[in-house]
Amino acid sequence: MGLFGKDRGERIAEFPCYLLETGTHLVPLPGILYNLVIERTYGERILGQFRGIGEAVDGALTGAGEAAEVPGRVAEVMKAFQERYDSGDKTQAVYICLVTEAAAGRHIGCIARLTGARAEGGELSVLLRGLVRAVVGQPVPSRRNEMWNGSVTVLDDAQRVATWGARQLDFARQGVFGAFEELDAGIGTFTARFKSSQKRGADGAAHLLTLSPLANTLFFHFSRSSFERSWKILRTMMHGFRDAKKDIRTAMDMLSVADLTVGLLPTTTAQRLEFLQAEDPAARIKTFVRHMQQLLEVFGSLYRATEYVHDRFETHGPIAKSQLIANQLRSLRFYIDDIKRNKPESGPGGRSRRLLPRPASGNSAAAGEEDDSEDSELVAIKRYVDEIEVKGVHADGVKMLKKDYRSLSKMHVQSTEYQMLRNYFDFIMGIPFGIYVSTPEIDLVASSRKLDNDHYGLVQVKKRLLEYLCVLKLSANSPGVTADAGAIEDGSATKRAVVYENKAQEQRKTKVPFLLLVGPPGVGKTSVAKSVADVLGRRFQRISLGGIHNEAEIRGHRRTYVGAMAGMIVNALCKAGCMNPLILLDEIDKVLSVPAGAGASRLNGDPGAALLEVLDPEQNHTFTDHYVGFPVDLSQVLFFCTANDLSGMSEPLVDRMEVIHIEGYTYEEKIAIGRHFLLPKQIRLNSFDMTGINLSLTDDAWRTVVVDYTREAGVRNLDRQLGAIVRGKIVEYVENNMSGSGDDVVTQKNLPKFLGLPPHSLREEVTQTTSFAEKYGVVHGLSYNSDGTGGVLVFEVIRSGDSRDKRLTVQTTGNLGTVLSESVSIATSLVKSLLARHVVHSSADDTSVAEFFRSECHLHVPFGAVPKDGPSAGAAISLALLSLALKRPVDPALCVTGEITLRGKILPVGGVKEKLLAAQLQGMGLALVPRGNRNDLVELAEDNAETQQRLLADPALPELATLQHKLGMAVHYCSDFRDLVLHAWPTADNLWHACEDSSVRPQL
């Protein structure tokens, strides 16, 4: 028959079972982490039955006596159960069915996975995580705390939920969600009222609430840090289900949330037992709703009782009031004495068996002092240290925090060291160890639609982000959220609990990519990161790295220094409240502006080098902040970085990230962004939508605003100018006594009224000629600026006379760099070679060429205050020198870019898209670019990958026609200097010789 019975397909024979002790009040539920503490010898005898099956068992039994070999049947049962109900982890595990009291003749329990165990002293701590409900068949041993192999029937909720109709699925979502929302509001109201009643200025009725033992018990439970963290996670999960689909997966998620909620809340043992024994999922949801309503009724009863006592209290005189208060104090003292006298419970044979967490044992003097302590914050630190091992903190951190707490408990409260250590613990308790916000179900269509709605264009960026979303959807193994038992049972956790982190679970975590968005200011790099955080359901944190010059800003200061604090990365985790947020490292190129070896770098460290560990997926799971002092796991943090220029960044840092270039927008794209995004935003921000007027701009007005009033790669200036137009319209509306409706169109003639006169157009400067200057020797080149934008440069060459030695000399000015000066030398040699070999000639006589060879020339590039460098001006300089030699002017609407060689080859250059955008804005009519940049032009012409491949395969160069229509100017390729000359003077006959004679043939 196999391991699973054929009648229901869920019965497992010979499954290890453990009958819980009656007085433990433990009701195991799926998804909850429990710590079982039993006598060591007895516990080792039980765990010895599973020796060799799981790493946790073998680790706990190290050094213990030999045990019998595990029966093959038990190992086979474990393997079969894992494959069917816990297949997410391939590591062999141990499972035990925790059995509770019998109800209606049936024993029901929860199958749990043994995740950790540790022996210390005479006790053994066993950590168990509930997985699924199960019904145990007869017979069941009569003695408690006994282990036996019995027949269990697994209650698989998925099989029953699969038979539900739409009405039941909707009830599952609405029932759990509605009950949770009401209870969440009720808990918030109760804690707020209780806190206000503790203040000195509260009225008498409010103070009476603190005298209720039930109110104090509830407030103590709700104010525990473990409960607050777990409840916050549940609240986040429930908010994610607000708009969830009415399907089977949502219903299963709601059942899991119900289990976690009942386990977290201070419900009674009878309520938890009733909830555990609800086999039918539909009945379980009804039970959940009823229990939540009962807890709300408890709050209402407390409020009504407080009001009743207050009304009766006011009718008594001062003596009666004093007697009532004295009775309260006397009862409290008697209760404290009883706690001190109580001994820990023992099972048969004097063996201590208990479930943790529970109050500290009465035979411990330190525990008694702690119970009587008035320092609630110190008690909170003690509780945190006791529970630190189940929070996923690194082993080094666990050891260090326990050592620091022992030191803290021995220090005087007034000492400086005490205050420093207290501040340190306050910060550590704020780090959200073990808290991961689960990624909601990924809808690729909705995600793509959101990215398109938030950003215009950016095709490559959206493509890469959708690839990452597909990986997440396929893997679907982001860290889950489970509540630990420290937030479930009453009392404080024990420092004996130790969790051995499962290595296989660590390996299943999806490695997140590190994306570096590079582009000019204002193109949407930061807003893209925000949109991705919304799509992934991750909390967003932004860290501005501009001006950071100290390594301690990243790694933190060592806490021995006065005023020490943690670094930006750990602080971002604290603000996010989880260990898997999306952190944006903004302007990462600015943090590396200090040259290597500079004084500041030596004194304060290199913050760029500190980022190497943060952005390395092989290292950041053990990132160490100097203030924290132990490794912090950053492996599930999604880092986005932005930069304007990569030239100042170190290669190792860039190599750790995937670089995505975001280019500047064309003016058509800017108009589309302004019309569909920016103008509606400004209308909304300035409340112009309340006027009922439909504001718009004409096409000519849009073009004028984009071309004349804003010269940038991004759209920030455009946003400001549109805001000025909207505010101007608001002034008109107010001056017209708040009257007006219908459409209001801003024309090109209206723009100076709102924006003033446009800045003087650079286009006029570069195209106009002077009356006394020669027209030849002037060529327009294209440049790529450090801010990611393009520009148009003017290369002017004039003949200032004959040189002294009758040889051609060229003087350069205009703040030219080394590479650009070398391009001038290369261009000079090339032109001299072509003219000397008569490859190019001007007329029948060569007087102009002869004059050129003995000339003293001067080459100048205007705007001398701006440094200029790079190889892409070689083609333009060569054409300018040839224009001077031949005395042939070049069309002022022509612009050139490309690196020139001594053989006349024109090599590809970078920033072609930005250069063409600049040429378009300056009104150029023809742009000549290297043939090697065809891929760049194809990407500029089309966004679709398939269309790009088709264009590249077409020898007719169809992308040039597309670009002419898109940019409004002609674009042509140039492979060598000959192509450049023929495009510059297309009407000149016989300007370039075919040169069949090898003695004069140019080596091209």
Swiss-Prot record:
GO terms for cellular component: peroxisomal matrix. A motif (Microbody targeting signal) lies at residues 1002-1004. The keyword Thylakoid does not apply. InterPro entries: AAA+_ATPase, ATPase_AAA_core, Lon_lid, Lon_proteolytic, Lon_Prtase, Lon_prtase_N, Lonp2_euk, P-loop_NTPase. Keywords: ATP-binding, Hydrolase, Nucleotide-binding, Peroxisome, Protease, Serine protease. It is found in: Peroxisome matrix. ATP binds at G519, P520, P521, G522, V523, G524, K525, T526. The keyword Hydrolase applies. SUPFAM superfamilies: P-loop containing nucleoside triphosphate hydrolases, Ribosomal protein S5 domain 2-like. The active site is at S872, K915. Its main location: other. It comes from the Eukaryota. Its EC number is 3.4.21.53. GO terms for biological process: protein import into peroxisome matrix; protein processing; protein quality control for misfolded or incompletely synthesized proteins; protein targeting to peroxisome. Residues 15-296 form the Lon N-terminal domain. It catalyses: Hydrolysis of proteins in presence of ATP. CDD domains: RecA-like_Lon. SMART domains: AAA. It is an enzyme of class 3 (hydrolase). HAMAP family: lonp2_euk. PANTHER family: ATP DEPENDENT LON PROTEASE FAMILY MEMBER. This is Lon protease homolog 2, peroxisomal.
